[in-house]
Each structure stands twice: as C-alpha cells, then as structure tokens.
Amino acid sequence: MERQGEVRISQCMIVKDEEENIRKALSWGKGIVWEQIVVDTGSRDRTVQIAESMGAKVYHYTWSDDFSAAKNYAISKARGEWIAFLDADETFAPGDGEKLPGILRQLESTKAEGIAAGWMQLDEEGRVSAAGTQIRIFRNRANLGYRRRIHEQLGRMDGTPMHIADATGELSILHSGYRGAAWEEKKVNGRNLNLILKELEDHPGDYEMMGYLGDEYYAAGDLDKAESWYRES
C-alpha cells in the first residue's frame, strides 16, 4: 500500500557479471525506493538470480557496445517519479540513502530536474583516491536521457541545459569499480578504448572524448599516443 506523500523512486542499474556487488547495490534501496530495475546485458554468473531473489525487476538487454543505449532502456522500464541510477559497484555513503526521499520531497514543486551529489572513488583499502560530483538522481521524464557509448552524459534530448539542484553537502556516492581484478580485466580486453574509438568515429569533434582517449593510452603506458590525444583535446 502506497503511503501518503511517498516519493516514488525507481532505482535503476545495468549489470553484467556483478554477483559480487549486486546484493550490496540493491540493499541500500530497500525501504527507500519504490522499485528496483536491473537490466542485465549478458551475465554468466549468478547476478540475475541474486537480483530476482531480492525482488528486483530484471530485464535482459542485448549488449550493443553502447552504455547509454542500455541505460536508456532501463529508464524506459521505470515507473517512478524520480530515478536513482547508480552502478552495481556504487552505493550511497552510510546514512545518505535515507536522506533521499526527504530531499526529493523538498524539490517537488521546484524546477529541479536532477540532483548533483558528491562522488568518491575508493582504493583497495577503502580510502578516497578521487572525488567530484555526479548527477545520478533525476526526474523520470521523456526528454531526459543519456548519450555517448561510454563516459555517458545525462541531459535533455534537445541539448538545452538541465535545472540541477545541489545536494553535494547531503549525498555522497561511493565507487569501488576502478580497482582490483575487475579493472585489470577492463584494461586487458580494451573495452573502454574500443568504445571511445567508436564514439570518436561517430563524433570526431568531441574534444572531451579525445581527452578520455588520452587517459586510456596513458593508463596502458603508451605515453606518445597519450600526449598526442591530450594535445588534440
């Protein structure tokens, strides 16, 4: 039974082989969100079974080398008023998830379409190795969605700026994905590099993406190519 004044939040994520993370990723939303939507892009482990056992709505999506396409598919399945789109290797800082409904209630009558939250990258010892802001909570509206195959950007489909509320002092997202075996696998199979190259084929004037390409070559130890792309960007 829906409670009066309840803010309906759809927690969304896209996953593949995330059995080590999916339980924690879904746990923060229990008792907070209205529905949990998991879009699986081809898991070979127990990700789907675990998500289903926790009550999530699981959908299957054929991977098309495009993170934005998969995320927009997940959004299309959401029925809540707001969407919280965190990755499977992300969660809110302790106690922050519980603040979310109250923050959204305060924004209900405003023009805010999205919320800027703090974002922290954790190393293998759980220490903060990088920090910034991310827009992961936004209204469920047809004119909002993601673009780019990788390093996705949320925005209005017509390209005009979103109205963003600042909640960086109240909400922080913790990310643990760029470390350990999972990160080494991404580097070895070149997934990120290949997707960036495809994105630049489609959008050769994307200077920000050129910078990301420089980052990939730098991480791979190819300093000459890294410098070349940094200069281009």
How would you name each of these model-derived features?
Residues 3-11, 80:
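Mobile, glycine- and charge-enriched loop segments
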Residues 34, 48-73, 77:
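Conserved donor nucleotide-binding strand/loop of the catalytic core
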Residues 13-35:
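Short, well-formed alpha-helical segments that are part of the catalytic scaffolds
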